[in-house]
Amino acid sequence: CMGYFNPDSGKQDLSQAAMIIEGYEEIDARFVEKVYCHNHHLPAVVCETPRLLVREMSEADLPQMLALNEQNSTENAVEGKEKTLEEEIENFPSYRRYMYELCDMGYWAVIEKQSGKIIGRAGIEPKIWNQGRSVVELGYLIDAAYQRQGYGYEACHAILLEAKERGAKYLYCRIHSENKSSIALAKKLGFLKIDYHVEQDAKEIEVYRYVCGNDRVLQERG
């Protein structure tokens, strides 16, 4: 599954390896498990909190995710028209391969440990904004039945820590100006509103930025 590149070993044939490593400093059980899951197209665990498990989505999750998206108020939504279930299923292998296995990002399932139920989705995705600007954007959506219980903050707080571990410097989120609960969550996490507008967005969409090195905010609000 993994191959070790040894510069002193002469010619190596590592063509069958799913992952090539050059050292062992950052190799642990979690890393090996993720490589195994990606090589076998299985959902890998992203992070955990006392109440939640955040993991990559599987095709079996898509009907529930589509139902979750339908709860999102159209007038406060940021993204465009939602795809049908058939379209989501057709596109999922490409999404999994690009987002999860190549970019090591994506939207992930948020699962309540006690019940084992999916209660939302959250994650980070690479985006291209104005004039080809590359950013990493945080998105989150919690099932209406589980809102106002701190789940959104708990999941996103863990994801911010994970994003920093994966090398992110800044994270951004786009929020409709009337979505007061989402704005409050972003501010609680440490996001600050910036004077920036994404060209394809409606004028009501605001942009917030988070500095991943802001450990003090994470510690104080954890």
What are these regions (language model features)?
Residues 7, 173-183, 200-203:
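Conserved beta-strand-loop-alpha-helix junction that forms the acyl-donor binding cleft
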Residues 15, 133, 137, 151-154, ...:
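Generic recognition of short, well-ordered alpha-helical segments
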Residues 117-118, 153, 178-194:
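Conserved active-site alpha-helix within GNAT-family acetyltransferase domains
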Residues 12-14, 163, 186:
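Generic structural signal for hydrophobic
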Residues 1-17:
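Acidic, Mg2+-coordinating phosphoryl-transfer loop and its flanking beta/alpha structural elements
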Residues 19-23:
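Short acidic-hydrophobic, aromatic-tinged amphipathic segments that line or gate anion-handling sites
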Residues 24-145, 157-172, 192-222:
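GNAT-family acyltransferases
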